[in-house]
């Protein structure tokens, strides 16, 4: 009997170290950023059991077998659709401004299509304006309405959107609503899903959170897009979830959320439609490819319209596309770079690009909220402040609420607006969407909004920052260690 227990003990020890060695080899064989690999290895060797479980749950990007098969199956039809779209040559811009050319070239090479011209574009900077405009567009819808949001929380003007959407479905408009399971978990506990389905709306809970499938799919892979598509001609996207800030997270102590959305009319809506169609098929298995765009662009539309490129990221989309786009935009800056983000936990490459821009004379400003709804992100963000300040970057801390807008403005000409935070999750993991606009008129509108943010912010003083308590520095470095996981 003693021999039996001895053998079991040795086998357990051998199995334990074999498991650690196997996971270590897996981490080393995967091509990932060095800080991320080192962080995972340290966690696994300091807390082996916790580290291994965490890595198997969150360490690698995988959709799950069923969704991966759907993503693979949809690609041939999507490729044919894109090929047919490319035949509509006159909706695509043939040239771009000097500062925008590298980014538009990258997008064309990696995504297969150029920027789409002849679009009307409006920047909406208040929740009231956005939701009221959305209700009006829903009431005018004739054929189809597609929506995807990370968070939908009933209350306030959001209920008017829900009522108008149900009314549209009842009068025969085909309505689809896809909401992230984790972000909208409160919504799925309300009567609204049943009410909407009874009205004829297809409601889908995307990327369902299921503890029993934690090793089969990454639970922190989220559907983070915010998109509305109406009649394949009107589209919205930006940072705003479907929430009324007067009723959302009032007990978080960070004030009301501040967002921006872009409303578009024109052929670019079709490219947003193909992104939605891919998401819908991955989640439901149903194919809903959008019709071709209205390719007849009037001369006045071409003259006054905006050139827009849509960048989508996530499993099934070009790998690291958002990250590459941001790097390209930062390196293209010659005079000024302004960035707004609620969560500042950049990759090493992006951090160095921003610092290098400031060091070569570009006027670089980053606007972040003073208070944040995530304690980990708040402390991890501060770990980057010293390096940014030393490089000459101006950091503004917004005091008028939780600044949730995500925007980049380069030299007053090239604008990026969308759902992407400057953190690891947005850059490499989640389903995200960003608009790239090559237009100094829209750039002036965005600059005006960013100037308003700056006016409601406090400029971080480098000397004062260096006098912060030692325990602040220690806490920042502790959370910085976990930044590859955030």
Swiss-Prot record:
This is Cardiolipin synthase A. The chain crosses the membrane at residues 3-23, 38-58. HAMAP family: Cardiolipin_synth_ClsA. GO terms for biological process: cardiolipin biosynthetic process. The active site is at residues 224, 226, 231, 404, 406, 411. Its main location: membrane. Keywords: Cell inner membrane, Cell membrane, Lipid biosynthesis, Lipid metabolism, Membrane, Phospholipid biosynthesis, Phospholipid metabolism, Repeat, Transferase, Transmembrane, Transmembrane helix.
């Amino acid at each position: 009997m003693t021999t039996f227990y001895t053998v079991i003990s040795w086998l357990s020890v051998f199995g334990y170290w074999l498991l650690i060695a196997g996971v270590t080899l897996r981490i080393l064989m995967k091509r990932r950023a060095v800080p991320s690999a080192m962080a995972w290895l340290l966690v696994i060797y300091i807390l082996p059991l916790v580290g291994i479980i965490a890595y198997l749950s969150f360490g690698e990007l995988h959709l799950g077998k069923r969704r991966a098969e759907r993503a693979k199956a949809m690609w041939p039809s999507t490729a044919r659709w894109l090929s047919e779209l490319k035949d509509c040559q006159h909706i695509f811009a043939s040239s771009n401004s000097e500062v925008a050319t590298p980014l538009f070239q990258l997008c064309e090479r990696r995504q297969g299509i150029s920027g789409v011209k002849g679009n009307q574009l409006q920047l909406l900077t208040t929740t009231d304006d956005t939701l009221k405009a959305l209700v009006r567009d829903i009431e005018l819808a004739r054929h189809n309405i597609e929506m995807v949001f990370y968070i939908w929380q009933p209350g306030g003007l959001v209920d008017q959107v829900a009522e108008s959407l149900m009314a549209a479905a009842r009068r025969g408009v085909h309505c689809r609503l896809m909401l992230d399971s984790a972000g909208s978990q409160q919504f799925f506990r309300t009567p609204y899903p049943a009410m909407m389905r009874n009205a004829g709306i297809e409601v889908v809970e995307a990327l369902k959170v299921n503890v029993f499938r934690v090793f089969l799919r990454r639970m922190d892979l989220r559907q983070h897009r915010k998109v509305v598509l109406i009649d394949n001609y009107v589209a919205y996207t930006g940072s705003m979830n479907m929430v009324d800030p007067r009723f959302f997270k009032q007990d978080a102590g960070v004030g009301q959320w501040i967002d921006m959305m872009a409303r578009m009319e024109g052929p670019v809506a079709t490219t947003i439609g193909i992104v939605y169609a891919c998401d819908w098929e991955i989640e439901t298995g149903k194919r809903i490819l959008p019709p071709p765009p209205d390719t007849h662009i009037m001369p006045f539309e071409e003259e006054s319209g905006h050139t827009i490129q849509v960048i989508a990221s996530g499993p099934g989309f070009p790998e690291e596309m958002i990250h590459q786009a941001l790097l390209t935009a930062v390196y293209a800056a010659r005079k000024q770079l302004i960035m707004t983000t609620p969560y500042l936990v950049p990759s090493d490459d992006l951090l160095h690009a921003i610092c290098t821009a400031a060091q070569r004379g570009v006027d670089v400003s980053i606007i972040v909220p003073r208070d944040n709804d995530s304690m980990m992100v708040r402390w991890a963000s501060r770990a980057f402040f010293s390096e940014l300040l030393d490089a000459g970057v101006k950091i503004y801390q917004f005091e008028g609420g939780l600044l949730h807008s995500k925007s980049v403005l380069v030299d007053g000409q090239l604008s990026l607006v969308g759902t992407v935070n400057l953190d690891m999750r947005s850059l490499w993991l989640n389903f995200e969407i960003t608009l790239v606009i090559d237009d100094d008129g829209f750039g002036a509108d965005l600059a005006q909004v960013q100037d308003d943010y700056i006016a409601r912010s406090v400029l971080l003083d480098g000397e004062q920052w260096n006098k912060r308590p030692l325990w602040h520095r220690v806490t920042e470095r502790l959370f910085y260690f976990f930044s590859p996981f955030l």
